[in-house]
Amino acid sequence: MPKCDVKTRYIPATFAWIVLLLTTFLFFFYPCQFYVKSHPWVLAYQGVITFFVLANFTLATFMDPGIIPKASPDEDCEEELRAPLYKNAEINGITVKMKWCVTCKFYRPPRCSHCSVCNHCIETFDHHCPWVNNCIGRRNYRFFFFFLVSLSIHMLSIFSLCLVYVLKIMPNIKDTAPIVAIILMGLVTILAIPIFGLTGFHMVLVSRGRTTNEQVTGKFKGGYNPFSRGCWHNCCYTQFGPQYPSLLNPKKYASRRSQVQNQAISTICNDRSGQQTGAGSGAGGNGTAAVSGGGGGVGSGGGMRGTAVQYSPRSFYDASREKRGIQVKTYMAEGNGYNQRSGSTTLYSKLSPGRECSDTDLEPPPASQSQDCEPTPPLQRHNSSSFYLPQVSDSGGLNGSVSTGGGGGGDSPRHMRLYHPRHSPHARPRGLDPQRGYTSDALSPDHPVGYGVGVNGSQQQQQQALAAAAAAAAVAAQNQRSATTTATPTMQQRIKPLGVATPLVMASPVRRSNPGTPTQPRRPDFIGLNAQAVAQQQQQQQQAAAAAAAAYYEYTSGLPPQHPQAPSIQQQQQQLLLQQQRVLMQHQQQQQALQQQQQQQQQAAVHAAHPQHAALAQAAYGGSPQRRFLSEGELVRQGAGGGVAGGELSYARSNNTVDNIRELAGSPQRGVYMWKDTSPGFTNNAGQQQQQQQQAQQVVSSGIGSSAGTLSSSGAAAGVMPHAQYMTAGGGAHPLIMTHSRLQDYTIQQQQQQQQQQAAAAAAASYHRSNPTSPTTMPQVSGAGQSYILRYGGGGAVGAAGSSGSLASVTASNPATGGGGYQPALRGGVAVFPPNPMGNQGGGNLQTQPSPQIKRKQTPTRPMSFVRALEMADSMEMQSLEQQQNGGIPGSGSVGNNQQAGGGGGGHLMQSNASNSGTPDRASIYDMNYEISV
């Protein structure tokens, strides 16, 4: 409605009052005299109706309809950098828009609208009625509705009584009284259509729970009205619901609230200075005061760093009683026990304590509240003894001499980390501690004893020690206060599983990852095993087991989950594991002599056979430390099997590696990567495969490798082989990590098997990595038979996957068995196949087999994939490195060079399979049809 002049606004209302009063007076003065003597109840009845009409009309005209005062200048300044012009509020599951009022300078509540005539925002705005010269809103709608109902009854009564009066005195129709009665009947007839129509319209609106504004604008047309309570309840609530106080005069309510105003809403300003101002500062401990008056919001968290200014809530209110009409949003109170978090941002309270996702219009001024910070916790009320917040004292300079609660990095005592048994791969709730992700495997409760400590192992061990001390201090404080607190999920904990980059996540040194690039691949840092490191590591793992509960791994191991529990239980599990290893060692040593005899017999048979006839029987797939996720097949096979080789995936995978497909290719790889052989002699004979597997079980032996990479021990070279990056042990060892107590058992085996290495020279096969982006060199110990160094098994006479911890069965094909070729047991995923290796057949007899040719188009239209480009780049780079380590001499096919490369202790064990070609690896690279199973 257009804005009217002040003088013209009163004309309709004045006319309405004149008509109402005049008609009522004329009715009582003329027609009603006829009913006084004969029907006196008519006068009383009509008097009551008239009273309700005038009373409701007066209230509807002069009552505050629910005006929301305009924002004060202080509040207006606060909203200079406000959010967009719309905000959403959810009411009964329906999202309702809240518009920004440019005139009143605030977001209008639901069902609120700005009246252009009154120039005010009206709560539950219905319409502006010119006949009452007032808006009809939340506070006066019931009186307006009662006015319409009573006026309708009043009009009907006047019309009916005047009609009866005229019919009674028809002979005297020319008198004054009958003429007045006829005029009143005519006036009622003229006003009947609008009055009765308006009354009926509002009856419908009341029954539906709508307003005139909502009905006219069609907000809930054909949809659900979240404000409706049902027909009967709508009528009762409209007429008999609560009467809300007026907001135009808040001073009249100030005296009523004076008794409760002493309860302050405190603002906590944490700084990193680490100054403790004594018991007066509380456990928050920095004594920084921040007072935000009048909604202006002076945030002084960083500017007043290290000060000890304190304002009592009572004195603050006493000094600002004259400003009671101005909204004060944040105040400073004594310390409430809320401790400093590990984040560098400053925490402020919002309008309501404990709120997290508040609207932007209710936020403090800019730069006062970070969206990643945790909001103010529930605060301690004045003179309250039932609020259990432990006062944590200074713990000797921990975390910058700022008192911390449970958990390393400064967890709050109000948010104690709960140690729950975790059987799910999903992330557990954590606080804002820096080490909340990518914890080293050495500190994992699921990690078996004997794994090498990662790069950040020492740092994380220190953090674990600090975390244990802080947790003990927090538990002691909890016991003193005899209270029990539970951790509540915060906004940061909800954002973290979603992958939102927060300053704390990006600033954490543990979370940083530098994946390799095609031009600059990064080598993983491996640390070899020795006796001291293993012993020290086992002791540290047992001590830090209780504090390492926050470690989380996406790749679950096959062992039973070892969650934080009593150290005695973990020691029993470790002792049981060592006993099983010793039993297996004794059993394998007894079978060693028989195995060596069988190996010598089969070596002679393999020397006479072609290299492509060497059979590879795929054993239990063990995975790779360079993959972080289980495939579908691995999930199915995880709990299957028994015995030595049955426990598939019974190891803890290294999770913080940087050269994995997920980080480089950008997609989680969940398939099983396998090779295929298209060489001549590849058959699908099921009986032959069973024969090979039975033969493999007779000649099986296992290799023990470090957690650095995938190793393979084959043939007579299955002994301990020291390497620059690897330490391999074979010859009947259990496929677990070799500890220092068992190195002496392999000293004799090493000497015997080194002699066998010199006697039997193996073929040099091109290595193939399970992860094309990994630059890890796959050393191969030469044997009589050919071996494929794959991450799911080994080949030749003897093979093992060292880091996987699974026993790789190897079959040596004998011409007497009546078949050639090999048949790897494909167990899921996309089958991807390497070329058949070429090798030395005995003393100097180098038989070169051409790589199998995969049929391709003459002019391939598809460009080289990213994975293949990385594979080619890595192969060429590793070839140059191998040539440099061998003194610049490429693989010449001589037995001496092969023996030197196979038995050497320092260089990479990688032999060229194409001695007649200048580019030995390039030929096989183009034959690799490497694909990724997604």
UniProtKB/Swiss-Prot annotation:
Residues 31-47, 164-177 are extracellular. Residues 337-349, 381-394, 768-780, 910-919 have a biased composition (Polar residues). Residues 397-411 have a biased composition (Gly residues). It catalyses: L-cysteinyl-[protein] + hexadecanoyl-CoA = S-hexadecanoyl-L-cysteinyl-[protein] + CoA. GO terms for molecular function: palmitoyltransferase activity; protein-cysteine S-palmitoyltransferase activity. Its EC number is 2.3.1.225. InterPro entries: Palmitoyltrfase_DHHC (IPR001594). It is a multi-pass membrane protein. The DHHC domain is required for palmitoyltransferase activity. Palmitoyltransferase that catalyzes the addition of palmitate onto various protein substrates and therefore functions in several unrelated biological processes. Regulates tissue growth possibly by regulating Ras64B protein stability. May regulate CG34450 mRNA levels. Belongs to the DHHC palmitoyltransferase family. ERF2/ZDHHC9 subfamily. PANTHER family: ANKYRIN REPEAT AND LEM DOMAIN-CONTAINING PROTEIN 2 (PTHR12349), PALMITOYLTRANSFERASE ZDHHC8 (PTHR12349:SF2). This is Palmitoyltransferase ZDHHC8.
